[in-house]
Swiss-Prot record:
Biological function: One of the essential components for the initiation of protein synthesis. Protects formylmethionyl-tRNA from spontaneous hydrolysis and promotes its binding to the 30S ribosomal subunits. Also involved in the hydrolysis of GTP during the formation of the 70S ribosomal complex.
Stated name of the protein: Translation initiation factor IF-2
Positions of region (G1): 187-194
Region annotation (G5) ranges: 324-326
GO terms assigned for molecular function: GTP binding; GTPase activity; translation initiation factor activity
Length: 690
């Protein structure tokens, strides 16, 4: 037996690669991933060890001894110890949690620092992960109450439908089953995306009925070693990102096609950035290896240098498969790698109940009326089901598979065409099955009314109104899409923007490219709630219209200094102002007056500065602080005033404090809000050098 990859050894042992990796870790065998090699000797040792473990597991276990009274009592005590507490979102404070779990604050602070290395202070507002660590330390379960919507109008009907599946995924994990992966092929123009899709389709799809296929539905399914893979056959990262922007992720895996004779090109980088933003696994297919000038090693080097993708054989974690879509060389291995990645990522679905699907194409057909091509995500879609989708509803009149053959049911990851919608549904949105056509109609009508009312107020992030969103996060993040006239300009922009990074704010460049601002850039910005900055480039008309429609902020500049200045101003506006205390005056209590129904009033001689009715005061007695708080009333003679300046006398009533004495010293101060400026990387390094 020659050396094997981990996933090949897993097959021999009838295990999943993930299970084998866990077993190897427990055995102390150091392997990086499922693509790592294991030599023959090591493979035999692993097989022997795991087979021995299996034999032991199958042996009947010895009968357990009956528990003694002490053991039973101990178990009862342990069970009693386990508590469950419910917290509201506004109760994530150390003092509240300490009270709820019955552990003193100081004890929690000490335990968390010593045992978990987490520094806390009394009354601190906690992050959710800090709360979880505290409760884990004391073996207490937690449940966070969800904040209720304040009005029916705020509830998105489709969000409620989507939530139904999220709850199923959380509460019924044991019912989830693996489903075939859905794959999107991306890459630079002329690198062979369509040729690859045609090759897979022609060699893997079952023979057609006589007359051939008359209509493509936008996706097809193939079978590989008894397992299915669904391919979306409308390649292009614009479609892929538009789905994400509409909250309808269909793709599980991206195959990035790069030509071996051309290397990494601008659209390759753009496609990669779209896939990366979606956080889906990427497999690289180096195509055209049959060409005389093909250079696979050089292409791999460009993957590292331009995309940061390190092939597994070079010690990285990116699967790279050399192929020829024209001859078919390497295509079978690519399909096997897709199945392997699907298995490693545990792509699952909820197979029962009402179906959920995503629309990949839709149109008005002259003969069939409104039609939609969908990929089923969960459940079973059936003829006769009532459905809703974005702007319309209907009843499934007919279903056609990817060969345009009529079927009665469609299963997860299966591509099908639906007939029966009242209108053409929005492409790239989700489809949900509901209990009846009447209910479907009601949902869509309510949603359309609410969307119309919100139309004017709905918009994406722009440089002026980031404040609200940013205050919700400790680390503030601004996503940027950069377009410039040359790669030199792109490099200069990146360099200038990186100097604006700070501890308080992170500038995340999602994509940077050369050329005019396109619809693809706008859809990416909409998907990541980002801002587009263009340098010496124009915005094409389609992109301009789409940006207005999606509410995406697009800015263009001809001077780099102006771009940087605008960005600086926006970043400064994202920081909350700092509160600074300013002492404004001092005084002394010369006389104490007792007034019925009012209490004690201090007769004060101002020594310097002034006293402000809207400010604060500290009272010192023999050098010790006895009170700090607000001024309830301030009088000059009998007149209510806002300010009294030295050397005048005045009468002061302190809010909630009457224990005053002659000779008490007063210090008056105000709290001012001072505009904060971020400490940019360049300024920080200058300060460190000084």
């Amino acid at each position: 037996m020659a050396r094997l990859r981990v996933y090949e050894l897993a097959r021999k042992l009838n295990m999943s690669p993930k299970e084998l990796l866990q077993e190897l870790e427990e055995l102390g065998v150091n392997v990086k991933s499922h693509m790592s090699y294991v030599d023959e000797e090591m493979a035999n040792i692993i097989i022997d060890l795991l087979e021995e473990d299996n034999r032991k597991a199958k042996q009947p276990s010895k009968p357990k001894k009956e528990k003694g009274e002490e053991e039973v009592e101990k178990e009862v005590v342990e069970k009693k110890k386990k508590k469950k507490i419910t917290l509201k979102p506004d109760e994530l404070k150390l003092d509240i949690i300490a009270e709820k779990i019955g552990v003193p604050q100081n004890k929690i602070i000490q335990d968390m620092f010593v045992k978990r290395g987490i520094a806390l202070r009394p009354g601190q507002i906690l992050k959710l992960e800090e709360v979880e660590q505290i409760l884990k330390e004391y073996k207490i379960e937690i449940e966070i109450e969800e904040e209720q919507q304040t009005s029916v109008e705020e509830v998105d009907e489709f969000e409620l439908l989507e939530k139904r599946y999220q709850e199923l995924y959380e509460k019924e994990k044991d019912k989830l089953v693996p489903r075939p992966p859905v794959v999107t092929v991306m890459g630079h123009v002329d690198h062979g995306k369509t040729t690859l899709l045609d090759r897979i389709r022609s060699t893997r799809v079952a023979e057609r009925e006589e007359g051939g296929i008359t209509q493509s539905i936008g996706a097809y399914q193939v079978e590989v070693n008894g397992k299915k893979i669904t391919f979306i056959d409308t390649p292009g990262h614009e479609l892929f990102t538009e789905m994400r922007a509409r909250g309808a992720q269909a793709t599980d895996i991206v195959v990035l096609v790069v030509a071996a004779d051309d290397g990494v090109m601008p659209q390759t980088i753009e496609a990669y950035n779209h896939a990366k933003a979606a956080n889906v696994p990427i497999i690289v297919a180096i195509n055209k290896i049959d060409k005389p000038n093909a250079n696979v090693e050089k292409t791999k080097q460009e993957l590292v240098e331009k995309l940061g993708l390190i092939p597994e054989e070079w010690g990285g974690d990116t699967i790279v498969v050399p192929i020829s879509a024209r001859t078919g060389q390497g295509v079978d291995e690519l399909l096997e790698m897709i199945l392997l990645v699907a298995e490693m990522n545990e792509i699952k679905c909820y197979p029962e109940g009402p179906a959920r699907a995503v629309i990949i194409e839709s149109k008005l057909d002259k003969k069939m009326g409104p039609v939609a091509s969908v990929i089923v995500k969960d459940g079973v879609l059936k003829v006769g089901d009532a459905v809703v989708a974005s702007n319309t509803y209907g009843k499934v009149r007919n279903l056609f598979d990817d060969n345009m053959r009529p079927i009665r049911e469609a299963y997860p990851s299966q591509p099908v065409m639906i007939l029966g919608f009242e209108d053409v549904p929005d492409v790239h949105s989700n489809v949900y099955v509901v209990e009846s056509v009447e209910k479907a109609k009601e949902i869509v009508e309510k949603r359309l009314q609410r969307l119309e009312a919100q139309k004017q107020s709905r918009k994406h992030i722009n440089l002026e109104d980031l404040m609200k969103m940013m205050q919700e996060k400790e680390k503030k993040v601004l996503n940027l899409i950069l377009k410039a006239d040359t790669y030199g300009s792109v490099a200069a922009l990146k360099n200038a923007i990186n100097k604006l990074q700070s501890k308080e704010i992170e500038l995340n460049i999602v994509h940077a490219g050369v050329g005019e601002i396109s619809t693809s850039d706008v859809m990416l910005a909409a998907a990541v709630d980002g801002v587009i900055l263009g340098f010496r480039v124009k915005v094409n008309n389609q992109a301009r219209r789409l940006a207005e429609q999606e509410g995406v902020d697009v800015r263009t500049y001809s001077i780099i200094y102006k771009l940087v200045e605008d960005l600086k101003l926006a970043l400064e506006g994202m920081l909350e102002p700092e509160e600074v205390e300013e002492v404004i005056g001092h005084g002394e209590i010369r006389k104490v007056f007792k007034i019925s129904k009012v209490g004690k009033v201090a007769g004060v001689q101002m020594l310097d500065g002034k006293a402000d009715r809207n400010g604060f005061v500290r009272i010192y007695r023999n050098g010790q602080l006895v009170f700090e708080g607000k001024i309830e009333s301030l009088k000059h003679y009998k007149e209510d005033v806002n300010v009294v300046e030295a050397p005048q006398e005045c009468g002061i009533k302190f809010a909630g404090f009457d224990d005053i004495q002659e000779g008490d010293e007063l210090e008056f101060y105000v709290i001012r809000k001072v505009k904060r400026k971020p400490t940019f990387v360049e300024e920080q390094s200058d300060q460190e050098q000084k």
